[in-house]
């Protein structure tokens, strides 16, 4: 019975992975850090590079990327819901990271919403990511 259960689990896993899209990831990883400020606020990467946001703060950070959708992505960790739909807004807990890879050249503007001692209790910092085509 256990062998049948293991075999069924293996078949289900393989069938589930068969439908995953091919990625065009490169080996390059670019970190955007949340510390006292967003660093770097402006970043230029190539198609397929991984952009990784890392929260070094003691409070969660909200990352808001208006217009984000699955068609523009070649990888996604932390920006999609349990159904695989890309979310424009994601919360990043302290000492955690999320990442995206873009599948085509695009300019992305986003906001980082960080809780702070500033009046209003929220510090909003804009960021820009320029995704350029790989060299020919």
Q: Can you say where each PLM-predicted feature lies in the sequence?
A:
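Short, Lys/Arg- and Gly-enriched loop/turn segments at beta-strand edges
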Residues: 59-68
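N-terminal edge beta-strand
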Residues: 22-50
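Extracellular/periplasmic metallocenter environments
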Residues: 84-136
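Sec-dependent signal peptide recognition
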Residues: 2-8
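Short aromatic-acidic-glycine turn motif
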Residues: 69-77
């Amino acid at each position: 019975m256990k062998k049948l259960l293991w075999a069924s689990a293996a078949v289900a896993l393989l069938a589930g992975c068969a439908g995953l899209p091919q990625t065009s990831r490169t080996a390059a990883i670019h970190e955007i850090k949340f510390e006292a400020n967003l660093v770097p606020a402006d970043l230029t990467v190539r198609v397929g590079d991984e952009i990784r946001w890392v929260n070094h703060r003691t409070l969660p950070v909200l990352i808001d990327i208006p217009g984000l959708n699955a068609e523009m992505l070649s990888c996604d960790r932390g920006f999609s819901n349990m159904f695989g739909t890309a979310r424009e807004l994601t919360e990043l807990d302290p000492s955690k990271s999320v990442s995206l890879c873009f599948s085509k050249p695009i300019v992305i503007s986003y906001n980082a919403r960080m809780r702070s001692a500033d009046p209003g209790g929220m510090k909003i910092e804009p960021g820009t990511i320029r995704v350029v085509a790989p060299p020919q």
